[in-house]
Amino acid sequence: MIIKPKIRGFICTTTHPVGCEKNIQAQIEYTKQQGKIANGPKRVLVIGSSAGYGMSSRVAAAYGSDASTIGVFFEKPATEKKPGSAGWYNSAAFEKQAKADGLYAKSINGDAFSHEIKAKVVELIKQDLGQIDAIIYSVAAPVRKLPDTGEVIRSSLKPIGETYISTAIDTNKDVIINATVEPATEEEVADTVTVMGGQDWELWLSALGEAGVLAEGLKTVAYSYIGTELTWPIYWDGALGKAKIDLDRASTAIQAQLAPLNGEAYVSVQKSVVTQASSAIPVMPLYISMVFKIMKEKGLHEGCMEQIYRLFTSQLYKQDGSAPETDQARRIRLDDWELRDDVQQACKELWPKITTENLFELTDYKEYKEEFVQLFGFSIDGVDYDADVDTVVEFDCLSV
């Protein structure tokens, strides 16, 4: 099949297996060049491991610390008529390379929210690794099926209290618009917390703890985002923000649970990056296009892989073994460079100046669009997109 990108809204409906593999190879090469992580983890479970920060965490653990990794994700393999999801190809590429390099890597494809997958992971850990010493929680799902009742709960990308009106980009037409988003109801806010809050992270730690597979000194981290004043109304002050605050609650509860093991639980607040999740949030494509340009000019720009390598080396696994630096809510702040006063002041000054006519000139919107399609394996150097490729990529992946 010859595959070209087809974009509908904030989703690319096609994926390119060769491009996805190149993406993973680039992350692996970056990590190898950085060198080994002192005191790094050796047996790592990544929940939500197929893309974004989760995949970068798996790469950092495996290639920065020679760790055995188990990845959990919910992805679609290809059919004869349709390519698989990008996360499927990413995971296949990682596992292929890891095994070629003599690293233990196994994956389980299924609903991370279910009891069944937790039981399957416990079984696999007991069988192959005995225990684990790190758990990365990086699930970005818009919908959650409650494991006890089967009820399906949906999250909302909405403000709280009043209608949100802001400058934004219509990414289909590449024009500046005024985006209007109606406020969430109380039920929508509660549902968003149920889907995107910390409850499932807690359930994972409980299931693994009860099974006795958590090692002494275990570290677990969940990824979050706070953003800036420009994005707070739709994000931190909106329904999503309430879910992220619930992650903080869960972090404290898990920390207490891990006390007998001298374990640690943290929320790590990351910088804004181009992901399918962030592209769905009104205002984020414009903000990201601006802040990327400013951070690149200042030599501060990082993608997912750079962020996670810095998280591991400067916070979670320091050479001297000391604890991470945290804010008042015990969060690790990897958004520190993005939130620098000079960066944010430049964003505030640039924001009102953006028009359709100067969008490509004043921001990194061209690069934003390119990075977006790269998530799906397109616009990657060294890939022949006119070549016929086999979309069916199989690997030894357990499914639940």
Swiss-Prot record:
Residues annotated for NAD(+) binding in this entry: F74, E75, D111, A112, V139, A140, K244, V273, V274, T275
GO biological process: fatty acid biosynthetic process
Keywords from the UniProt entry: Fatty acid biosynthesis, Fatty acid metabolism, Lipid biosynthesis, Lipid metabolism, NAD, Oxidoreductase
InterPro entries: Eno_Rdtase_FAD-bd_dom, Enoyl-CoA_Rdtase_cat_dom, FabV-like_NADH_b, Trans-2-enoyl-CoA_reductase
Residues the UniProt record annotates as site (Plays an important role in discriminating NADH against NADPH): E75
Pathway(s): Lipid metabolism; fatty acid biosynthesis
Pfam families, sorted: Eno-Rase_FAD_bd, Eno-Rase_NADH_b, Enoyl_reductase
GO molecular function: enoyl-[acyl-carrier-protein] reductase (NADH) activity; NAD binding; trans-2-enoyl-CoA reductase (NADH) activity
Transmembrane helix is among the record's keywords: no
Family: Belongs to the TER reductase family.
NCBIfam families xref list: EnoyACPredFabV, PRK13656.1
Protein's name in the database: Enoyl-[acyl-carrier-protein] reductase [NADH]
Organism: Psychromonas ingrahamii (strain DSM 17664 / CCUG 51855 / 37)
